[in-house]
């Protein structure tokens, strides 16, 4: 199916995938390309709009990322954000300098409401700033359309050439008018209509996989989580019983999860499911390991080795399915962005693995994955399962992993999830879980001194996992969860609640 396309040019900002997410919320498909993509390649893609992302560099830095100036002569609307805004100004003859006062965080912005970019935005508002340099003087032919107290060019436009730049991050939720501004760029300036939907995505992906695989055999890394479940269903609809799902029970799952996954997928989906119990193998490899990156690498390595062994038992296997999604990719780092932490679906893959990968969801954000799942008829209870990392409880037990610690966090997590569901908060909170932060503290229980583990509770609200706020769970629910865990889980005498947003923290502790 032919779609209108917006290209997002990656200059290394951590919000790059979020920009793509916001464009898709406008009902338009977009792709992210590296900054050194040639003009010829850009022309071949025939984009209807181009967005330059932010990035950590200065336009005056050595080997700073840039683009060919010809991109501004294609007749395609361009929107620069933060560094992308500064780069546009620099390349077109404006003046970029070190700001006398840096702007970080929420900032009051005055906008020119006569600009097409700010059409329908009735009042000035708060925008999210994060910059050291700023545009001191806009290029010739550009008009200043927004300012702050310390930033003389918070936004600029060349309406005739349809070139626009904003110093603030329109893509983050903190910018009050950000989504409306992006809608104006996509619909009013680029002239695009809604053409991107999860129903059409699912149909196209099923067709694509059917053509790619043909009669070959496929092995699916099934965990029972939302991502792997939807990935498995797409491939199952494409090739039927030529898909074999391997469910690795590595001993790092949540309470009763292994039995639930096996029962649901065999009964409701009629898939070829093989459950492999290798808890001792994984725990043996992880014994004495405390570093979180090492844990992830070990788990990624063992996952692939288990699949290789099981594939030999199944017969000829040509492809491996993984539930990799967009945030997995951005958090594992790109050519221009710093690695935050290696994701198990990306950084943990051995270089000598013997399969070709099929990653049907790598273009999607979590809410899009859920929407595809609904389109495919996956039961609501599975589509809305809590996100669960591939390394499982290994990264929710900080420090060295033992069976005792796993049992503690498993039971505490089950209580937390049960009470959140009882309070009907399970679909309004993006993600919630318990973790064991490797902290012991003094307490008093039954008139006796204790020196026991601390459990940390984490709950966040988000729409895409790129940014999140800590969830404001009612105190009475937190109180109930705390009392239950302390009374019902042996070895715990203290409960803490994590009230850190992302950024600066990540959602998981490791």
From Swiss-Prot:
GO terms for cellular component: cytosol. It catalyses: XMP + L-glutamine + ATP + H2O = GMP + L-glutamate + AMP + diphosphate + 2 H(+). Residues 5-195 form the Glutamine amidotransferase type-1 domain. Disulfide bonds: none annotated. GO terms for molecular function: ATP binding; GMP synthase activity. ATP binds at residues 223-229. SUPFAM superfamilies: Adenine nucleotide alpha hydrolases-like, Class I glutamine amidotransferase-like. Keywords: ATP-binding, Glutamine amidotransferase, GMP biosynthesis, Ligase, Nucleotide-binding, Purine biosynthesis. The active site is at 82 (nucleophile), 169, 171. InterPro entries: Class_I_gatase-like, GATASE, GMP_synth_C, GMP_synth_GATase, GMP_synthase, GMPS_ATP_PPase_dom, Rossmann-like_a/b/a_fold. It is an enzyme of class 6 (ligase). Pfam families: GATase, GMP_synt_C, tRNA_Me_trans. Residues 196-385 form the GMPS ATP-PPase domain. PANTHER family: GMP SYNTHASE [GLUTAMINE-HYDROLYZING] (PTHR11922:SF2), GMP SYNTHASE-RELATED (PTHR11922). Homodimer. This is GMP synthase [glutamine-hydrolyzing]. It comes from Clostridium beijerinckii (strain ATCC 51743 / NCIMB 8052) (Clostridium acetobutylicum). The gene is guaA.
